[in-house]
């Protein structure tokens, strides 16, 4: 019995170790091509997206209102465009999105604007979507953070 347990432990560690360790390798980690954004990603330790198998996991993209803006749709359009760029870089598109999670600083006032913009990018059949109320975001002008899960095109 003593020989079986160490052998089983060794077999288990050799099977799961490389699978877990190999998920985030060059080519599967997508970093920003914008120097300012890349610096933030490197300083804070995150990437634009990770490709794991046939699934793409995007980091949250923050929709931020610029000084003097009153139309929230402008902030959402910039965020959705950025998400589209990341999806394209990963070999995917809005048509391949399976899940959207959005974190809102004011759900009631923001929903009409995000829904209007989302309709321009997300077509039927629709992905799953969860919208969550939160107290604040970084940066301070952030109104909504949008997190995406998509599949690679076959």
Language-model features, listed with the residues they occupy:
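N-terminal presequence-like segments and the immediate start of the first folded domain
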Residues: 3-11, 17-98, 104-154
